[in-house]
């Protein structure tokens, strides 16, 4: 019961932040709760720019075609500031698997329907990264970055993950991931 209440609070907070009218918020919640078909999905998402950012959304697609994301995971440098920025280019810094509000917007997306076991595999990769920080490096030189996280999740759910994820801009990596798996 607590999971349902927590999910409802999260869903309503997201809806309120998106400036959805009150009636639509209730409809969205009802659509999610009353859905008879919740097909698990894993989404590989990226924002363009330099350096950009790749992240993973995990959720369900309802029978009405609406995708509801239950979790977002992005790998970020844990610290900020000039010294940290220099170090993350030339060395390794502590990283953090986290969710940020800006992870609700993306320029590139590859959404894959999966079964419950593959959804659990995606979550297991996130749990592994949360439990043992692999160390962040912008170019994945001796460390890992947001694109390598997306690549590990892709492999865990059975996708063909292109090599060199850490050395590509995130949006470019998601484009290559789509092409490698036959998506337009």
Enumerate the predicted regions with their spans.
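N-terminal secretory signal peptides and thylakoid transit peptides that target proteins
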Residues: 2-16
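Second-shell loop/turn segments in exported
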Residues: 44-45, 106-114, 133-141
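Glycine-rich catalytic cores of cysteine/serine-nucleophile enzymes that process amide/ester linkages
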Residues: 27-108
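A structural motif
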Residues: 114-126
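Activation targets extended, charge/polar-rich intrinsically disordered C-terminal tails
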Residues: 38, 123-184
């Amino acid at each position: 019961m607590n999971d349902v209440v927590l999910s409802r609070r999260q869903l309503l907070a997201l809806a309120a932040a998106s400036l959805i009218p009150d009636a639509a918020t209730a409809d969205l919640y009802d659509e999610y709760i009353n859905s008879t078909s919740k097909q698990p999905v894993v989404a590989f998402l990226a924002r363009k720019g330099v350096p950009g950012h790749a992240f993973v959304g995990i959720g369900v697609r309802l029978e009405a075609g609406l995708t509801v994301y239950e979790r977002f995971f992005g790998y970020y440098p844990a610290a900020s500031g000039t010294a940290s920025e220099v170090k993350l280019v030339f060395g390794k810094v502590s990283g953090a698997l986290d969710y940020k509000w800006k992870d609700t917007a993306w320029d590139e997306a590859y959404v894959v329907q999966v079964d419950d076991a593959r959804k659990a595999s995606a979550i297991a990769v996130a749990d592994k990264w949360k439990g043992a920080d692999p160390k962040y490096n912008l170019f994945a030189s001796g460390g890992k970055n947001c694109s390598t996280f997306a690549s590990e999740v892709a492999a865990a759910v059975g996708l063909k993950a292109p090599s060199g994820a850490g050395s590509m801009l995130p949006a470019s990596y998601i484009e290559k991931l789509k092409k490698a798996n036959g998506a337009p």
